[in-house]
Amino acid sequence: MRKGQGYSYSVIASVLVLLCVVVSRIECSSQVHALSRLYLSKRGVGGSSTMDTSHFKAVKDLKPSSLRSAANQEGLRKRDLIRRLPGQPPVSFDQYGGYVTVNESAGRSFFYYFVEASKSKDSSPLLLWLNGGPGCSSLAYGALQELGPFRVHSDGKTLFRNRYAWNNAANVLFLESPAGVGFSYTNTTSDLEKHGDRNTAADNYIFLVNWLERFPEYKGRDLYIAGESYAGHYVPQLAHTILLHHRSFFNLKGILIGNAVINDETDLMGMYDFFESHALISEDSLARLKSNCDLKTESASVMTEECAVVSDQIDMDTYYLDIYNIYAPLCLNSTLTRRPKRGTTIREFDPCSDHYVQAYLNRPEVQAALHANATKLPYEWQPCSSVIKKWNDSPTTVIPLIKELMGQGVRVWVFSGDTDGRIPVTSTKYSLKKMNLTAKTAWHPWYLGGEVGGYTEEYKGKLTFATVRGAGHQVPSFQPKRSLSLFIHFLNDTPLPDTSRY
């Protein structure tokens, strides 16, 4: 091939294409695949891109007819009470699971799983947790692999307690969104072609309004919205939508986003710099990449031969790593065990957890206990959607939304597991730098149990950035105790401890 001859893939495809085969649909089997697919689609890989990447514009005309009457909500709430999940250890708090309609005419309903605080539920705040993808389940990741009260054993049948669950500090609501994710569904097939950031924020808003009719004691309660990965879009977009519609029963206090997709350009640049700084690629490879590849292009571009060669080398250097935690073991045997593995503990990450969760949530008795899959969906439950056909809009940045929220007094915390290679700490630092914030406290370690829990810096305008030492993309999966400590300090609006005595 002649020097300078064009290649059909954009530069980002060179690292991501091996993670998820390029086809016209958005579905993928895991969070890493789903996010990779989105980036490929945004840059026109595998065909021309029609995705809208302009700044987020919330739906302003959410019609009252979309908001379900509260008349029968008490009965629905009683029906949603989970008596006990199969294989569950005893607990002292209530759990609920069920559906909330977000669009009556389309037959669009979202599945939720709600766990009350383990103590002081009547005074504890409400946390809504969203996972990203786009197209991945908060039940699969947030609830059963990260911050929920249970984890799934290797037998795919039984559960064990997460002593560092976030319902130690809050009432926690997990949402599968948008329709087509997990147990959430639509009776209108064309809905699956209309997904994007804008419609997802609108539906999430309507869900929350209707859910509060079912659980009215949480109206006016301190509300926090949190999430990871592509929820770096979902969370500030929903917060913006809430503020836009001025409903008095929302008492939005803050947002919390982890290893979050914030700004495409800095997310990509930070990923490559992280690879080099962590000895995954050579200095020469990084220099050649920056010299020969256009890392700033927001649409499909032609790649030179030199760019293709160095990109292929980076592929080879990073292909056999778990990019979501570069130091984590890989799942080499996903076969379920007859009995739970001996010595299973919340502090030890199991790379095969995805498989245990998928087996558990596809058990008919589990779905019955959760009040899930009532319509008998024509496909198995999956951690990331296989039915969402298209993602129509995804802004290149959510920085304007974050700054807007700060300007309205909303507390913003951004955290980063420091072993994630997909949206690494370098990406987040570059994105924050682009915001031109003024530091309030200098960069310093924070502590838990006499050890460094991570590093943190506070900025004027109610924004805190914190790393979590030894954590990957799904921070609570790898460092449950440190993540809970961070969450509690976020809720209390107190600085992370700057002394090893803590």
Curated annotation (Swiss-Prot):
One GO cellular-component annotation of the UniProt record comes to:
extracellular region
Q: Quote the subcellular location field of this record.
A: Secreted
**E.C. designation(s):** 3.4.16.-
Q: What does this protein do?
A: Probable carboxypeptidase.
Query: Could you say which enzyme class this protein belongs to?
Result: hydrolase
Glycosylated residues, per the record, are N103, N187, N333, N373, N436
Q: Domain of life here?
A: Eukaryota
Annotated protein name in UniProt: Serine carboxypeptidase-like 40
Signal peptide positions (record): 1-24
Record InterPro entries: AB_hydrolase_fold (IPR029058), Peptidase_S10 (IPR001563), Ser_caboxypep_his_AS (IPR033124), Ser_caboxypep_ser_AS (IPR018202)
**Which UniProt keywords are given for this protein, alphabetically ordered?**
Carboxypeptidase, Disulfide bond, Glycoprotein, Hydrolase, Protease, Secreted, Signal
One of the GO BP terms on file: proteolysis
Q: State the disulfide connectivity.
A: C136-C384, C293-C307, C331-C352
GO function terms (MF aspect): serine-type carboxypeptidase activity
Gene that codes for this? SCPL40
Gene3D superfamilies according to UniProt: 3.40.50.11320, 6.10.250.940, alpha/beta hydrolase (3.40.50.1820)
Tissue/organ expression: Expressed in roots, leaves, flowers and siliques.
Native organism is Arabidopsis thaliana
UniProt family annotation: Belongs to the peptidase S10 family.
| Catalytic residues (UniProt) | S229, D420, H473
Report if keyword Hydrolase is assigned: yes
